Amino acid sequence: MTIYALSSGSGISGIAVIRVSGPETREIITKMTSGSFPKAKQATLKKITKIDTKEVIDQGIVIWFPGPQSYTGEDMAEFHVHGSRAAVSYTHLTLPTILLV
């Protein structure tokens, strides 16, 4: 099972961090970003998009932590998006659509 959560705390902030962990993490990164897949443990600036329309949600940092060398032991990612309610909400709304497909 792949899980995701806001890890930086709720409320408006400069940056919000959403963590994803589980076997579908690689697929989530591929579907929500464009261009090349990020290198392991390297912060990469990416456009983060809705999967159905490819509308840009935000431009932020994506960090890929392949398992078992991640701190969860599974494939894991962090999406660092702007901390507005809109960016966080749209990212949270997009993640389950990937997991249900």
Q: Where do the protein language model's features map onto the residues?
A:
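A glycine-rich (often HGG/GG-containing) alpha/beta subdomain
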Residues: 1-95
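N-terminal low-complexity segments that are often proline-rich with Ser/Thr-Pro
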Residues: 97-101
